Every structure is written in C-alpha cells, then in structure tokens.
Regions:
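Short, charged, surface-exposed hinge/linker loops at domain edges
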Residues: 1-5, 9, 35-70
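Short aromatic-glycine-(Arg/Gly/Cys) micro-motifs in beta-strand/loop hairpins
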Residues: 4, 9-23
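Short histidine-centered beta-strand/loop micro-motifs
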Residues: 19, 29-30, 56
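Flexible, active-site-adjacent loop/turn segments at secondary-structure boundaries
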Residues: 22-25, 46
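A short, exposed loop/beta-hairpin motif centered on an aromatic-Gly-Thr core
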Residues: 24-33
C-alpha cells in the first residue's frame, strides 16, 4: 500500500496531548506525544479509507509573536 507524509500539529491540554493533521482535518489525542501521533495516524488512515483525497498540499507553518494583555 502506498504511503504519504502528513503533518501533525500538537498542543497540550491539561494531561493530554491533542494532535491534528491539517491536510486532512483529523484530530486525536493521547497521554504522550507518541500516543497522540499514533492515534492520529490511525484516525487519518481510517478517514482516508472512506474519503480518499485527490491530492494533498503541504501546509505552510509559520510562527508569529503577538502582544498578550492581562
């Protein structure tokens, strides 16, 4: 089966890590970063079985600074 590289964007919420695949829109979570990515991989593969993507473009990821008041 052919494979494709996707992006995982992670952030921590309390005691869980949330992982999102921006190319597909799938989201999953885990107690560790590794578990969150493994769960995201599984969710993405299951999603793509039902809804194949015609083509996937890599997202542009940028970091920016913003003023925070409070």
């Amino acid at each position: 089966m052919p494979t494709q590289v996707f992006t995982a964007v992670l952030h921590q919420e309390e005691d869980l890590y949330v992982a999102e695949c921006p190319e597909v829109g799938t989201v999953s979570q885990g107690k560790t970063i590794e578990e969150a990515i493994a769960n995201l991989k599984e969710a993405t593969e299951l999603y793509l079985q039902e809804f194949p993507l015609p083509s996937v473009s890599r997202p542009i990821v940028a970091v920016f600074e913003a003023a925070v008041h409070g």
